[in-house]
UniProtKB/Swiss-Prot annotation:
A Pfam family recorded for this sequence: Peripla_BP_3
DNA-binding region of this protein: 4-23, 48-56
Record remark: domains: Consists of two structural and functional domains: an N-terminal DNA-binding domain, approximately the first 60 residues, and a larger C-terminal domain, approximately 280 residues, which imparts the function of corepressor binding and oligomerization.
PROSITE patterns per record: HTH_LACI_1 (PS00356), HTH_LACI_2 (PS50932)
Pathway field: Purine metabolism; purine nucleotide biosynthesis [regulation]
Protein name from the UniProt record: HTH-type transcriptional repressor PurR
Function noted in UniProt: Is the main repressor of the genes involved in the de novo synthesis of purine nucleotides, regulating purB, purC, purEK, purF, purHD, purL, purMN and guaBA expression. PurR is allosterically activated to bind its cognate DNA by binding the purine corepressors, hypoxanthine or guanine, thereby effecting transcription repression.
Record's keyword terms, sorted: DNA-binding, Purine biosynthesis, Repressor, Transcription, Transcription regulation
One GO-annotated biological process of the protein: negative regulation of DNA-templated transcription
Complex and partners: Homodimer.
GO molecular function (one): DNA-binding transcription factor activity
Source organism of the structure: Vibrio vulnificus (strain YJ016)
Binding site for hypoxanthine: F73, K189, F220, D274
């Protein structure tokens, strides 16, 4: 097995130079980099991660806790994180928790044992139990990427769900809709509570009376959207528009309503939330609230790198602002 000395000898440079090229820890002339990397390829040299971590006190690995990586919103954020990890020479360890505390606890312990340089947390709800578990590992830099209370030991990115809920509802109202239903995720989720607050604020500003029976609880997946569509279609006095708290439910709702013979948006308008890639290509293309998912991933990784370099820095909170994306699923009725 080739060693760093073999690489240095073949490239005609010092072992220190080889180390800087491989670890990207100092500027090295491009011609020298090419010689070193050519020698690395010829010798099939692979640096020892264990030796490097002992010497540099870093493993160049990042852990990421997510509720479910197959969720289209999460997957686009993860893609952004992974891309920037790769560019910076970091390895990403992805931990799917399913929202189960025992898995969250075990993964955090495993990441601590692996001496990861930092942890990104993107769970569908940051419970008090999970917050306490994260705070027990205060020595590991962390960024909380979405919902839940602000951890005393972590930086946080806030998605401003209340603002997004307000924007979606106001757009429906501006297009003449007063009979508006909303399909939420689980009511106890912080993001859902905030989006409902935004929904209610827009309705109150427009002096529109709320029908609490039209605030439906889902689970951010298609199955509950199908059940909600069946319920809405069965009502004699139906809403003219539905605000869905994510695009997955919006697309599921639209599909089922169309199966039941209701046209979108002629018979009922729909607005979603997240602006996942699929939303643009559905028929009709979905009007929605955009969250900058890949930028969230990039910013979270950059913030975490800053925290890794300066663990004593004051805790930071960064805000992201949702934006309306107008497509073809909202009918103007005034």
């Amino acid at each position: 097995m080739a060693t760093i000395k073999d690489v240095a000898r073949l490239a005609g440079v010092s072992t220190t130079t080889v180390s800087h090229v491989i670890n990207k820890t100092r500027f090295v002339a491009e011609a020298t980099q090419e010689k070193v990397m050519k020698a690395v390829d010829e010798l099939n040299y692979a640096p020892s991660a264990v030796a490097r971590s002992l010497k540099c006190n870093t493993t160049r690995t990042i852990g990421m806790l997510v509720t479910q990586s197959t969720n289209l919103f999460f997957s686009e954020v993860i893609d952004g994180v992974e891309s920037y990890c790769y560019r910076q020479g970091y390895t990403l360890i992805l931990c799917n928790t399913g929202g189960i505390y025992e898995k969250q606890r075990d993964y955090i312990r495993m990441l601590a044992e692996k001496r990861v340089d930092g942890i990104l947390v993107m769970c569908s709800d940051l419970t008090e139990e999970l917050r306490e578990m994260l705070d027990k590992h205060a020595d590991i830099p962390k960024v909380i990427m979405d919902w839940g209370p602000i951890s005393s030991q972590a930086d946080k990115i806030i998605d401003n769900s209340e603002e997004g809920g307000y924007l979606a509802t106001k757009y429906l109202i501006d297009n003449g809709h007063t009979k508006i239903a909303c399909l939420s995720g689980h009511f106890e989720k912080a993001a859902c509570q905030e989006r409902i607050q935004g929904f209610k604020r827009a309705m109150k500003e427009a002096n529109i009376t709320l029908n609490n029976e039209w605030i439906l609880e889902g689970n951010f997946e298609c199955d509950t959207a199908v059940m909600a569509a069946d319920k809405i279609a069965s009502w004699q006095d139906r809403p003219t528009a539905v605000f869905c708290f994510n695009d997955t439910m919006a697309l599921g709702l639209m599909s089922r309503l169309q199966q039941l013979g209701l046209r979108i948006p002629e018979d009922i308008s729909v607005i979603g939330y997240d602006n996942i890639e699929l939303a643009e290509y559905f028929s009709p293309p979905l009007t929605t609230i955009h969250q900058p998912k890949r930028r969230v991933g990039k910013n979270a990784f950059e913030i975490l790198l800053e925290r890794i370099k300066d663990k004593e820095h004051d805790k930071r909170v960064f805000e992201m602002h949702p934006e309306l994306v107008v497509r073809d699923t909202v009918k103007k009725i005034n």
